[in-house]
A protein has these predicted regions:
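Walker A/P-loop NTP-binding motif
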Residues: 1-5
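Conserved RecA-like ASCE P-loop NTPase motor core of nucleic-acid helicases/translocases
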Residues: 7-19
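ASCE P-loop NTPase helicase motor core
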Residues: 86-167
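Inter-Walker segment of RecA-like/P-loop motor cores
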Residues: 18-77
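SF2 helicase catalytic motif II
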Residues: 75-90
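ATPase catalytic-site recognition across NTP-hydrolyzing enzymes
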Residues: 146-201
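Short catalytic-loop micro-motif centered on adjacent basic/acidic residues
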Residues: 11, 78-81, 106
């Protein structure tokens, strides 16, 4: 269900540097310029970027490394978290969409300890049927059976390179298939009880 404009949207990124290097060039390519009234901070490396549209809607690019209190007080309709935010930042942004009955989207690969709170507080309750308000979409880069790319701009050769780059099955599961992993047992990955254990003497 899409709300009627005007709406306020936050695109939350890990840092301003990531916005300048990665996000802004993509936005520049995809933005329907005819629908834009003004892009505040478009050519600035320090000013917060806000795109104001002709229908009154606004798209704010917000850095997750801002202090939590700087996120307080706003009322927004939709929030996109690009990569996993800290839990306190997520909770603050969640409070921003309450009064509009808005929604949040979190996009990430579960590759480090920073994602454990998402697994414990959101993903596992979703799997157990305790959070009907949550939807989970796995977006693997390739078919795990055929190895064929599921991403239009990746070739089968790209997929094979990724598999070489991440030979560890757990890392591959997280990076290529979006599966939560627990990095346990990696210190002695080749440990075999039959080979490495002896009876007490």
């Amino acid at each position: 269900e899409v709300p009627e404009p005007p709406v306020a949207v936050w695109y939350i990124i890990p840092s301003g540097t990531m916005f300048r290097r990665t996000i802004r060039p993509i936005v520049n390519k995809l933005l329907p310029r005819a629908e834009v009234r003004h892009w505040y901070g478009e050519h600035s490396s320090t000013q917060q970027n806000i795109i104001s549209f002709r229908n009154g809607s606004e798209l704010h690019f917000v850095s997750a490394d801002m202090r939590q209190r700087r996120l307080q007080g706003a009322s927004i309709h939709f929030a996109i978290n690009d990569e996993t935010p800290e839990e306190d930042i997520f909770e603050e942004v969640q409070a921003r969409v309450l009064d509009t009955h808005g929604r949040m989207l979190v996009v990430f690969a579960p590759i480090d300890a920073k994602t454990f709170w998402v697994r414990d507080n959101l993903y596992m309750p979703y799997l157990n049927g305790e959070r009907p308000d949550i939807d989970v979409i796995h977006m693997p880069v390739s078919d795990p059976v055929t190895g064929e790319s599921l991403v239009p701009w990746f070739t089968k050769t790209d997929i094979e390179r990724m598999e070489l780059q991440w030979p560890d099955p757990q890392v591959r599961a997280a990076r290529m298939y979006g599966e939560f992993i627990t990095r346990s047992g990696v210190v002695f990955a080749s440990f075999d009880k039959k080979t490495h254990c002896v009876r007490p003497f």
